[in-house]
Every structure is written in structure tokens, then in C-alpha cells.
């Protein structure tokens, strides 16, 4: 999804998104208000906004204290929500079908940063393990990302 599409999604959910001068975080949510650091690229803003929408949909209460296991779990859930929104298993397959050969090409195709793509792959590796089948494809996460069409 593009940043504009995510802004539309946020608006439909009743969220108010503002770009601000944030010093410590790229994004924050409080209630139905999301702040996005204004000095990032559009691609970076989209990745951050996807996660903040994920927090809106999955997080309960203040989770700033990451020493609390419950807060860490909620953070992972919000990130997974964002990864699924921006990339998803089908997005990885579409990138493969479009001829993407490396992480730079995949990230560019999916309109995400390479860092965000790598974090997503790590998250999927933790969730699915070595591989995951989707439709007529096997997506391998270990040792590296690979997609194989099952005939």
C-alpha cells in the first residue's frame, strides 16, 4: 500500500494522522491520533504508518515499557499486522512472479524499505519456521528468502 492509501485507510478507521517533528520515534499513536515523523521519505512514512495502524487494531493500553513481556508481544502483533498490510505472503509471491531477484528489487516492487522487508522476513521466519506454502508456491525463509512454484 502507498502512503496515500494508508492515509485513506486510517481516515476510514477514524484515525487522525499528522506529520510532526518527532525526536525519538518515527511514529506514535495515542487514542485515535497518529503522529508520523515528517522528515522521512514517503516509503518510510508508509512503513511506519502501517505499524501504527497495526497498533490501533491490536494494542491495548500503554506498551512503552518493553521490559514487560506482554508489551513486547503486543509490539510484535502490531508489527506483524503492518507487515501483512504492506507485504504479506502473497506480496512476496507477486514480487517473485514479477521477476524480482534480490531484496532491493523486492522492496522497491512492494514500496517498502529494505530494512522493513528484512524485518518482515525475520518476523515470518519466527512465525512460520523454515517455509510456508501459499497457493501453489513454497516460500522459504531459511537460509534465505526463496520462492518456488509448485507444479
Where are these regions (language model features)?
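Active-site hotspot residues in diverse enzymes, especially metal/ion-binding acidic/histidine motifs
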Residues: 1-151
Amino acid at each position: 500500500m502507498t502512503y496515500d492509501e494508508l492515509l485513506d485507510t486510517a481516515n476510514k478507521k477514524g484515525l487522525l494522522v499528522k506529520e510532526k517533528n518527532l525526536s525519538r520515534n518515527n511514529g506514535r499513536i495515542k487514542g485515535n491520533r497518529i503522529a508520523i515523523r515528517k522528515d522521512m521519505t514517503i516509503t518510510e512514512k508508509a512503513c511506519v504508518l502501517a505499524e501504527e495502524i497495526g497498533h490501533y487494531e491490536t494494542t491495548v493500553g500503554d506498551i512503552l515499557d518493553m521490559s514487560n513481556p506482554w508489551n513486547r508481544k503486543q509490539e510484535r502483533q502490531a508489527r506483524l499486522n503492518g507487515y501483512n498490510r504492506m507485504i504479506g505472503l502473497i506480496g512476496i509471491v507477486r514480487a517473485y512472479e514479477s521477476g524480482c531477484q534480490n531484496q532491493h528489487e523486492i522492496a522497491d516492487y512492494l514500496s517498502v524499505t529494505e530494512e522493513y522487508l528484512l524485518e518482515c522476513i525475520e518476523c515470518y521466519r519466527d512465525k512460520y519456521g523454515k517455509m510456508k506454502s501459499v497457493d501453489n508456491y513454497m516460500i522459504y525463509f531459511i537460509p534465505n528468502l526463496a520462492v518456488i512454484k509448485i507444479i
